[in-house]
Design a protein with these regions (language model features):
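Elongated, amphipathic alpha-helical interaction scaffolds
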Residues: 1-194
Length: 194
């Protein structure tokens, strides 16, 4: 493949594509802007990002994370992008979260020291088919419907539903080959073609 052919191929990448997302996620500013929008927290700070982190498991399946962000409040946030709808996505999120949690634990840790983790799962389809751009999946006590805080937040976002919200507008940018939106300056600076 010639250099010109490679340049043409790169022009077709969109933020939802794994290869391009890896490049975007390497920019702390892009990750911070994205998470502030998705998690609806204007004060959220991303201190560090580890892109394509391989979490090894000597006894079974390992996992490769798209982006693992370390937040200013000490929480970790795993961001995954998924185009294919040929998987059990809830179990994938559960598996990834468990691997990250185990990898971050020490032999003598008390369970109260278990990390707080957010998993943001961005998909090119509406995983729950309920017509929402964002879903928060919580642990609840079935009998009382009370939410239980076990330190894991699961947030599913998609690029399909267009509901007029800022999150929906941002997710629509993930489908574009070129982004030019003043509301999202960090993403625009990385994806805009001059």
């Amino acid at each position: 493949m010639t250099l010109e052919e490679k340049k043409e191929q790169v022009k077709n990448f969109r933020p939802i594509d794994d290869t391009f997302f890896e490049v975007l996620a390497d920019d702390i500013g892009v990750c911070q802007e994205m998470l502030r929008i998705i998690l609806e927290d204007e004060k959220l700070v991303v201190k560090d990002v580890i892109v394509q982190s391989s979490e090894r498991n000597l006894y079974g399946r390992s996992v490769r994370l798209d982006a693992l962000c370390i937040l200013g409040n000490g929480k970790k946030c795993n961001v995954e992008v998924q185009r294919s709808n040929k998987d059990h996505h809830l179990k994938r999120v559960r598996f990834n979260a468990s691997v990250i949690t185990v990898r971050d634990s020490q032999t003598d840790d008390k369970f109260e020291e278990t990390i707080d983790l957010i998993v943001v799962y961005i998909s090119e389809f509406d995983i729950f088919k309920r017509g929402r751009v964002i879903y928060h999946v919580d642990s609840v006590i079935r009998e009382t419907q009370e939410k239980v805080d076990d330190g894991l937040e699961r947030v599913f976002v998609n690029t399909v539903v267009k509901d007029g919200t800022t999150i929906s507008e941002y997710m629509d940018c993930f489908l574009q080959k070129e982004v030019d939106n003043v509301k999202f300056p960090k993403l625009t600076n990385r994806v805009h073609m001059p």
